[in-house]
Amino acid sequence: MANLPNTSHEDTVGTTGHEWDGIRELNNPLPKWWLYVFYATVLFSVVWAVLYPSVPGLRSYFGGTLGYSQRDAVALSLQQAADSQAVYRTKIRDAAVEQVKADPELYQFSVSGGRVVFAENCAGCHQSGGIGTKGYPSLADDDWLWGGTLADIERTLRFGIRSGHEEARVSQMPRFLADGILKQKEIEAVADYVVALSEQKPGNPQAAAIYKDNCAICHGDAGKGNRELGAPNLTDKIWIYGGDRNTLVHTIAQSRNGVMPAWSGRLDDATIKMLAVYVHSLGGGE
């Protein structure tokens, strides 16, 4: 240690005059450019605090000499967006949904706007792109419980399914086991028969008889369903809750009665029509 060379820059830099146990502190000030930048940022922050909202108080805050407000800016931006869309939305509101689809300009506007509305209000259940998930039907295929025309989709959106609205779509599947209509063995036989229907195979004649007496009135003798009643097609292997035997047994025994909200009153007429056009465009529209 004693033989190490002296590398001190004391002769060229100088010290601050402080010394601790023989250790001296060299005086190396910050570069001037760094100091100038620092002073500029301090000055900028002071000017900013004077011009814009900055210092909070107990009940309010200093609003700045410019009177700027982010809330007002957002409100203005939203109003400007609404004003720019007003011409299209008025036309959509006053037209039938079929006319909206027939007009290329309105159709493109509706698909673009409907996509945003769908993401905000519908994708939570039906998933992005309307692909659906267990308990929530796909909107991208050609299998519809209540019909897939523009008018059908608009009505479903407007009034919902079992939503409590006086014009809602309503159907009621019995709880065949819970209500004592069928016994467990009979329900299992019907489930096997439904599996056979979905696979386009002949089912057990005894199970077919039980199906005909209890299920055909809604689903049809051939299991093709009935859109007037919201009864699904049982022959296309498209299932909302699942098509395996155990799931079918549970569905028959305890029933399924999902609910879709009525969007009338939550969304305006133009938005509902835009949403109907978007859903129709997903691939399964009729």
Task: Walk through the language-model features, giving the residues of each.
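Periplasmic c-type cytochrome electron-transfer domains
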Residues: A2-E105, W146-T156, S171-V194, S264-H280
